């Protein structure tokens, strides 16, 4: 049978399930696919299909992630679910699966637990902009007052981490009950079964509350420079992959990073040896720049729309330190450690100024396998922005992954 063509008729949104171990993230993922399959919007997946997630590599780190896709009446979703807690931490920090929003799964029988808190904090730090809550295992709670208490507790916790706790939709239900109802009768329609209806209600909330993200092409232009060469008689060409936005011949752009920011005009764009009038996010292009000498531009700089990105040296970040099994260090490192920070396309040396634990205490030492808040200073300014991912390297091997949470200077 010929492969089906991917029809882009509905807006696309990336989401994922987050929350404490055993609160039902994977069961909920299975329940969503089974529920939407009744309306033709998904292929039902079993728990075991999702839980046996294949390994992937992102920024040199191995992560287990399951990807499922489904559709509601309004949207197409790509949904990511991770089997293990460490996989979540790595996934969120490396941005291997970017989330436009998340479904926080909390067991109504247990209430918020340590990883509930940690995943909310991580979502805040790495820039997951919106959260919808599913209070799972409602069938195990006989007392409505208890359910209200858990809901209140979740709202307070979300507010603690600067999410709008009072406004976030919280949907109660039972993923397992919904799956059982659907496996005994796959033709259940909306309105036939209260547990299945609760999954539909959750997806209504996700449709309504998580906004359709701005597509990469709608954002301001940015391209990290991977290589530079001169074409005799024509000028200097910078090559790279356009990270976001659209760029046209005749546009003015800034060259940012390492030294003073320069402004220039684009006189030509090429892709696969063909000339283009414009390049879009995702394209690998060569951009011909007017009046720029080969000496004034190098790998690691970025081309951007004027005034949209500035070079910085000091930043706060959320970092995951690789274990030795993952190819990281065997020993801890301390404040003052000077690794390389691999930012977009280049290594920049920097020193680690401070480590801070989740509770705000200063930590002197970090062990392989830890997740920590880290303040760093680079030896020269490069184009950095909040939400940007980077790797920490030592002698060419990756020893950590991070995401910028705040620019200091």
From Swiss-Prot:
Its EC number is 3.6.5.3. The keyword Cytoplasm does not apply. Residues 81-84 are annotated as: G3. Residues 19-26 are annotated as: G1. One of its GO terms (cellular component) is chloroplast. Keywords: Chloroplast, Elongation factor, GTP-binding, Hydrolase, Magnesium, Metal-binding, Nucleotide-binding, Plastid, Protein biosynthesis. Residues 10-214 form the tr-type G domain. It comes from the Eukaryota. It is found in: Plastid, Chloroplast. One of its GO terms (biological process) is translational elongation. Residues 174-176 are annotated as: G5. Residues 136-139 are annotated as: G4. One of its GO terms (molecular function) is GTPase activity. Mg(2+) binds at residue 26. GTP binds at residues 19-26, 81-85, 136-139. It catalyses: GTP + H2O = GDP + phosphate + H(+). Coiled coil: none annotated. Residues 60-64 are annotated as: G2. It is an enzyme of class 3 (hydrolase). Belongs to the TRAFAC class translation factor GTPase superfamily. Classic translation factor GTPase family. EF-Tu/EF-1A subfamily. GTP hydrolase that promotes the GTP-dependent binding of aminoacyl-tRNA to the A-site of ribosomes during protein biosynthesis. NCBIfam families: EF-Tu, PRK00049.1, PRK12735.1, PRK12736.1, small_GTP. This is Elongation factor Tu, chloroplastic. It comes from Thalassiosira pseudonana. The gene is tufA.
């Amino acid at each position: 049978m010929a492969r089906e063509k991917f029809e882009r008729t509905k807006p696309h949104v990336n989401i994922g399930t987050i929350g404490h171990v055993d609160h039902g993230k994977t069961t909920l993922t299975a329940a969503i696919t089974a529920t939407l399959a009744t309306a033709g919007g998904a292929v039902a997946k079993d728990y075991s299909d999702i839980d046996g997630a294949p390994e992937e590599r992102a920024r040199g780190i191995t992560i287990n992630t399951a990807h499922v896709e489904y559709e509601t009446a309004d949207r197409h979703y790509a949904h990511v679910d991770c089997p293990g807690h460490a996989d979540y931490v790595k996934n969120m920090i490396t941005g291997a699966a970017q989330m436009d929003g998340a479904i926080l799964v909390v067991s109504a029988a247990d209430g918020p637990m340590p990883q509930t808190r940690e995943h909310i904090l991580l979502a805040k730090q790495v820039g997951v902009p919106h959260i919808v809550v599913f209070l799972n295992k409602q069938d195990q709670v006989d007392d409505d007052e208890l359910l209200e208490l858990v809901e209140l507790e979740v709202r307070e916790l979300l507010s603690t981490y600067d999410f709008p706790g009072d406004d976030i939709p919280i949907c109660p239900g039972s993923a397992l009950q919904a799956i059982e109802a659907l496996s005994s009768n796959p033709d259940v329609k909306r309105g036939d079964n209260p547990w299945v209806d609760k999954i539909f209600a959750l997806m209504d909330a996700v449709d309504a509350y998580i906004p359709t993200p701005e597509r990469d092409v709608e954002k301001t232009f940015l391209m990290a420079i991977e290589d530079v060469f001169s074409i005799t008689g024509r000028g200097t060409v910078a090559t790279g992959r356009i990270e976001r936005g659209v760029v046209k011949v005749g546009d003015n752009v800034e060259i940012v990073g390492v030294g003073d920011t320069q402004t220039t005009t684009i006189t030509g764009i090429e892709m696969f040896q063909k000339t283009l009038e414009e390049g879009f996010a995702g394209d690998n292009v060569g951009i011909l720049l007017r009046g720029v000498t080969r000496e004034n531009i190098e790998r690691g700089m970025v081309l951007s729309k004027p005034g949209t990105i500035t070079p910085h040296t000091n930043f706060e970040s959320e970092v995951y330190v690789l274990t030795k099994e993952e190819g990281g260090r065997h020993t801890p490192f301390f404040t003052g450690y000077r690794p390389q920070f691999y930012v977009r396309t280049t290594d920049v040396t920097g020193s680690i100024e401070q480590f801070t634990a989740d509770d705000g205490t200063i930590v002197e030492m970090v062990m392989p396998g830890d997740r920590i808040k880290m303040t760093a200073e680079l030896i020269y300014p490069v184009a950095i922005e909040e939400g940007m991912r980077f790797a920490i390297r030592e002698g060419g091997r990756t020893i950590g992954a991070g995401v910028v949470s705040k620019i200091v200077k």
